[in-house]
Amino acid sequence: MVSHLIFTDFYSKKFQKMKYSSDSEDNKKETIYTYYFTEQEKYAKIYGSKTLVFIQIGKFYEAYCTRKKGYVNLAELEPLLNIKFIRRDDKPIKDGKPPKPNQFGINCVAISKNLSIMVNHGYTVVLFDQKSDGETIERECVGVYSPGTYLSDIQMQEANYLLSVYISEEKQLTCNKNLMAIGLSLVDISTGTNIIHEFYSNKFDERFGLDELVRMMQTFRPVESVIYYHPVNIDESAIKNVKLYLELDKYHNVHFYIYHNNKGEDALNLLTENSFKINFQNDYLAQIYEMNNQLTLNKKQSPLEILGLERRNYAAVSLMMMLKYIAEHNVLLLKNLSYPEIYLYNKHLILGNNAIEQLNVIDSNNLELYNSKISSVFDVINKTSTPMGKRFLKDNLLNPLSQENKKEIIKRYDYIEALIQGNIFKEIKTELKNIYDIERLHRRMAVGAIVPYEFTRLDNYYKATNRVYSVIKDNDVIKSIIPMNIFKEFVEYQVKYNKEFDTEKMANHANFGEISESFFRKGIHEDLDKIQEKIDYIQSLIKSTNYYFTSIIKDKCKKLGNKEILSMESNDREGYYFTISKSNEKILKQEIDKKKGIIKIDLTIGETLDIKKDDIVFKQLPKGRTKVFMAQLAEYTIKLPSLTEKLTELIKKKFIKSMVTYYSNHKSMLHQITRFVSEIDFLVSGAIVAKEYYYCKPSILSENSIPSYLQAKDLRHVIVERLCDETVYVPNDIELGNVPNIIHTKNKKDSSIEEVSIDETDKFKKVLGKKCNGIVLFSNNWAGKSTCMKSVGIAIILAQIGYYVPATEFNYEPYMALYARITGNDNIFKGLSSFALEMTELDAILMRTEKQGSNTLVIGDEVCKGTEDISGRAIVASALVSLSECDSTFIFSSHLHDIQNIDEVKSLNNLRVYHLRTEYDEENDCIIFDRKLMPGSGPSVYGLLVARYLVKNPKFINRAEIIKKRLTNDINVNLIPKKSNYNKDLLVKQCMICRYIPTTEYHKELESHHIHFQKNCWTDGKIKEKPYLSKNKLYNLVVLCRKCHNKVHQGEIIINGYTDTTIGPLLDYNMDIKKKIINGIKAVDDLEKSFKFSNNKSQIQKTKNTTVKKIQTSKKNNLVCEYA
């Protein structure tokens, strides 16, 4: 029977016992050490070198090591767990005996917390518990815990995936090649989520299988992986190359094995001949997924067919491996496991070639940012309140919906729009804050691991969920997120368990320690009620007796501090008794003597207890106390511990059974409730982001599947615009693909893309409004081309998870695939040179765009920069032609200006060329970045422009610096600059127009001025003209003296804002030329006065003429802003 294979066999192998009888302490210790090292060695061979065995010794779990035995690096746990490591092997040998092993112990009460820490740091932990019958002590293995198979009671927000992969190398008959067929299974033990996927290479795309496996690993980021490679022939070099290609060094806890000649190399035997046999698979899966009843009803379907695996042989093998791996750790985790969800390749936007990392979607480690709070797109748009919502958002970012899920995408836009209207999202957000991880608590219900206190919390989360539903139930759009009949069942489920449990009493039980009061309601379980009645009677005896004797003496006794006059104590032999101080003992005896033969005590339950006063015994105790013993009381109370133990055991058994039953009976409904909370949290986050950051609702015009395109107005980069504090982010208009004429007609009047002369664009045969599949973008470094290109890819991802995008208008048709090849992301793990890797990835991209090119977006940054000029131009030109011919949409950046003169490129009528303009500012010795897309290729020798800024002659610079200081009247005054009232990062130090600096001799007040006047801003601080900008950010503030400030408000000076340059933001303003010359001559006269001690009159005149000339011809006055 499979049940025997899974359950009985597991326990017989894993729960091995060790017995020893009473003996000398030294002999027992020697036995323990020998046993420990045997088990440590055995389990390390099975689970790997990072395996730790802990055995229970009394109240501690202990581990041992010497320099050669056990886990020799045991001392590394000391800083990790903050527990002392006891070193013993450095002590001298005594009586010919070696020193005892080093020791590390964890208190039993703290094992759960420390186990979680060890597992999260990649250890596999094996626990042995201690049991005793009084004569012998037994120790047995109670669990094996690894990162992917540990069901923690500590709530985690991230997914916790275990990955199982079967890679089979298949020999081909039609060609002399071996191709990869791969089956993949994923499970999150903490939630029960189960995913399977199967894919293959083909003779035209041999690397597809491994590339797809890499993509899945990058997407789901498993905490533990088991990979079996089944090659045709054993070739160590080929095996090494596979491991390098999969970049396994980037992941933790990877177990890589080889299967060959019907034999695997792992100690667990995860893959055997039986794993490939259909009958064995059906029996095994029927047992795991409890399909026996279903099989009776569906005699025509096997378990493989029910699970959709009948045509997915490789996925079935990977699933078998994973289930066996879980069983070898903790078989109970297989209980109530969800049916595997088949990953449908065409239902998700394929983020190929590691686009997730290259576009900084999630937790990027290649984005050079100094703001640790924002390192990815996820950091910007995550406004979720619950762990489920957070996981739902992250899962969608990693697996956006594809064109085939267009209806769902549009539905999400409508949901967010409805949430924004009337600010409904704010009310829902308030309730979502009261909900934590329902999904993981449901999983703990499913496996019977939940404790009473957790169910109380779950009940509170349900109540908050009810309140969320009450907010949306009358909204015709949002209420469709969850069917009404599902929520009706949810309410009925709550009514049902509240009839069974008193959830308030549950809150007192964080575990199944001693329970003296049942939280099951009376009448539910007769056996519990009977035990509870006995316990209640005994507790009434204790309480009433204490109250009676205290009441007859309390007015005459001395009470010491907060101590009770009569203290209740107990022991196993005598049950409960009272203790009293010696001084109060006399008073109590006197009061008892006044009573007649029988003392009648009224109990709280309405009965009476008769106590003979002669049966009350006083016995002296140490420390000035006296024991007051009553036989009638002891007769009952001595039974209390055993009754409490029996009650606790019964409650635990019945509670776990109820939990598993509730979950099994309402499994589908509970799953949909979890989905409802996750999705509404996800949508509320989208509404908050759209409202707060002024994102726009994307528009999908066609209901049918058509070639993909995008048309964005004022598109911004999600991350970069949030980091722009000193200068305004410059948005751009982007158009790719065959944009419908209706959009061009709509935007014809207000299109911000500059018209281009026929001569300039003739070679590309392109006119605005016609089909444009691709863009080639030229610019020098730092100009923002990567930011511009990434903004397109990120906007598509946001749009295809159903979120609004950072633009003022965004029209598009969803894509099926997005590939990125961006500079600075070379990966040496694959064992290829930078250029070889680039060509390998380019080859894969071009090959995969051929199949669905019209629905593919490709982003390539500086392709072929790793080779010489002629080859580079030829490769880039050929790539542009290939992508254009298959109708894919793409943006390529390049430094190779000559490609536009290649005949094949000239002939492309669906390609457009742009550049990002930069200028060199001689006066300020800096490069000014325009950041705006301009038609045409721009200057081809901009490298010289950069060189003028970067290449310095020290002697020349020093001399220029001296002259510059004289010309700008740079007076050094040791005054502490003030900070602006509007923004503490702005130093009020110098007028940014006339460059006046306050002095102690003559002081004019400096003021902070809003470039966009405050009267032109909304009450929430947003600028009316540009609502995505805030009035008190540095980009909208300028320091002015009173004189210049008045000129600004009189219109004599017009401030345009700041321009981004290599030396920081520079102020751009215009003023009346005549007034400017007059002011300039006055400045020169002041300068001449400052040279009154100089004899070099020719130098003074030369400086004067130069300054006036500059003032006359300049349209900008650029002064670097100074910030705190």
UniProtKB/Swiss-Prot annotation:
Belongs to the DNA mismatch repair MutS family. Gene3D superfamilies: 1.10.1420.10, DNA repair protein MutS, domain I, MutS, connector domain, P-loop containing nucleotide triphosphate hydrolases. Disulfide bonds: none annotated. It comes from Acanthamoeba polyphaga mimivirus (APMV). This is Putative DNA mismatch repair protein mutS homolog L359. GO terms for molecular function: ATP binding; ATP-dependent DNA damage sensor activity; mismatched DNA binding. The keyword DNA damage applies. InterPro entries: DNA_mismatch_repair_MutS-lik_N, DNA_mismatch_repair_MutS/MSH, DNA_mismatch_repair_MutS_C, DNA_mismatch_repair_MutS_core, DNA_mismatch_repair_MutS_N, DNA_mismatch_repair_MutS_sf, HNH_nuc, MutS. It holds the Pfam family MutS_I. May be involved in DNA-mismatch repair. One of its GO terms (biological process) is mismatch repair. Keywords: ATP-binding, DNA damage, DNA repair, DNA-binding, Nucleotide-binding.
